[in-house]
């Protein structure tokens, strides 16, 4: 309960060396308190490393869109999304990205922000965790 209550307040997160740590913090902020960010790895066809086929549900679509967003950041903007740090704030149940528009930092932050908010608004279906990707994807 204390964790849930603390997430309702505002939190400033300083830039970190690895974007994936920042993305993890965004996910923690938006998902239900009874879940951990680790439950969102190996979920569906796209949540986790790689991805193929058709997303199995809305949550998996969040990961599909995030993968494509990272792909666009790499190809169109020559960014490295997995290591690009950025400035952001978690406040009032939303996420604000602060870096200048068009910069790699802002592009990657927007990818992560969109995915984290999508996770928070999507149903988690336990049967889609660790699915047989060869069969269902």
UniProtKB/Swiss-Prot annotation:
Its EC number is 3.1.1.4. Residues 11-18 form a propeptide. GO terms for biological process: arachidonate secretion; lipid catabolic process; phospholipid metabolic process. Ca(2+) binds at residues 46, 48, 50, 67. It is found in: Secreted. It comes from Bungarus multicinctus. Residues 1-10 form the signal peptide. PROSITE patterns: PA2_ASP, PA2_HIS. This is Basic phospholipase A2 beta-bungarotoxin A-AL4 chain. Snake venom phospholipase A2 (PLA2) that inhibits neuromuscular transmission by blocking acetylcholine release from the nerve termini. PLA2 catalyzes the calcium-dependent hydrolysis of the 2-acyl groups in 3-sn-phosphoglycerides. It catalyses: a 1,2-diacyl-sn-glycero-3-phosphocholine + H2O = a 1-acyl-sn-glycero-3-phosphocholine + a fatty acid + H(+). GO terms for cellular component: extracellular region. Heterodimer; disulfide-linked. The A chains have phospholipase A2 activity and the B chains show homology with the basic protease inhibitors. Keywords: Calcium, Disulfide bond, Hydrolase, Lipid degradation, Lipid metabolism, Metal-binding, Neurotoxin, Presynaptic neurotoxin, Secreted, Signal, Toxin. Binds 1 Ca(2+) ion. Belongs to the phospholipase A2 family. Group I subfamily. D49 sub-subfamily. One of its GO terms (molecular function) is phospholipid binding. The active site is at 66, 112. InterPro entries: PLipase_A2, PLipase_A2_Asp_AS, PLipase_A2_dom, PLipase_A2_dom_sf, PLipase_A2_His_AS. It comes from the Eukaryota. Disulfide bonds join 45-137, 47-63, 62-118, 69-111, 79-104, 97-109.
């Amino acid at each position: 309960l204390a964790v849930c209550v603390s997430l309702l307040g505002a939190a400033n997160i300083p830039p970190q060396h690895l974007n994936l740590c920042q993305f993890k913090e965004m996910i923690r902020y938006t998902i239900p308190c009874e879940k951990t960010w680790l439950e969102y790895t190996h979920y569906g066809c796209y949540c986790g490393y790689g991805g193929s086929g058709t997303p199995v549900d809305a949550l998996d679509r969040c990961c599909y869109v995030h993968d494509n967003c990272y792909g666009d950041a790499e190809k169109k903007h020559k960014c490295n999304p997995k290591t690009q740090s950025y400035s952001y704030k978690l406040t009032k149940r939303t996420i604000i990205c602060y870096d200048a528009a068009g910069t790699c930092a802002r592009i990657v932050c927007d990818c992560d922000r969109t995915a984290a908010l999508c996770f928070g608004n999507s149903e988690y279906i336990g049967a889609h965790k660790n699915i047989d990707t060869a069969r269902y994807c």
